[in-house]
């Protein structure tokens, strides 16, 4: 079986996801080939296919720091990618032998490469790679017709502080039907290779796979590149894919403001759209707030969308007293 290897030329998560999908479904279609794909995403939160984006991510922090967000097409939990993290994908023909212990089988050479550098990496549990009982790689898989994809992250020099910052959502306030991410002890490979850079590590890993797998390098044609870019923009970068797939959930929040009193909101969301919203509290409105709630129902549950509506609302103070639009948004989206 012929093996091919490719490294993404960009750090754009939407392009990288689209390229991965193209390699899985279109490259050498109907041929028995193995593909090894390396890629990196700059400053990106990735949620699993079946996760609730709103439940997993602090969207205000992401927006403030200009962090990318996208939903991958495989399952698993939410993760943070930066350029200290390396992603790898291994695509194989779907056979009975491959499907047995797929995670361990497909990542053996990743472990061998690290072991060759005297890094004591091992496969552990169901889908993790560990060093001395600390996780440095989490794996997920996806099946497309006659092919199997196993992909994973490899933490080389990732900034772990970003995990808490962007994924630190108060789960007690969200009754979610999605799958919550589980925090695990993690480690950067760089702790065992302190003099190496991420770029050097990636280069050496590519060389290792090229030699051990006798792999041929893939060069994208202009036609393939155009298809990947189109798919990235129209699908993986779309609101419908990243938010619209979100499970139905109810959000409740309450806050007291010295200038405006107690304020509480209940929001019901289905497929990323507000289907019901109610406001309660002792804020000093002078008119019925029902027209505001009616205006919000049917809108995307999105900070910028709500901000625009509130800024365009005539006589905001008549509805919400001394409460400021940014304070109201903070309650609705759980931002301080």
From Swiss-Prot:
Example GO BP: protein modification process
Reaction(s) this enzyme catalyzes, per UniProt: L-lysyl-[lipoyl-carrier protein] + (R)-lipoate + ATP = N(6)-[(R)-lipoyl]-L-lysyl-[lipoyl-carrier protein] + AMP + diphosphate + H(+)
UniProt GO MF annotations: ATP binding; lipoate-protein ligase activity; lipoyltransferase activity
Keywords annotated in UniProt: ATP-binding, Cytoplasm, Ligase, Nucleotide-binding
Residues that bind (R)-lipoate: 135
Pathway: Protein modification; protein lipoylation via exogenous pathway; protein N(6)-(lipoyl)lysine from lipoate: step 1/2; Protein modification; protein lipoylation via exogenous pathway; protein N(6)-(lipoyl)lysine from lipoate: step 2/2
Domain BPL/LPL catalytic: 30-217
Keyword Ligase attached: yes
Record family assignment: Belongs to the LplA family.
Function: Catalyzes both the ATP-dependent activation of exogenously supplied lipoate to lipoyl-AMP and the transfer of the activated lipoyl onto the lipoyl domains of lipoate-dependent enzymes.
Further details from the record: In the transfer reaction, the free carboxyl group of lipoic acid is attached via an amide linkage to the epsilon-amino group of a specific lysine residue of lipoyl domains of lipoate-dependent enzymes.
Protein's name according to its UniProt entry: Probable lipoate-protein ligase A
Designated gene of the protein: lplA
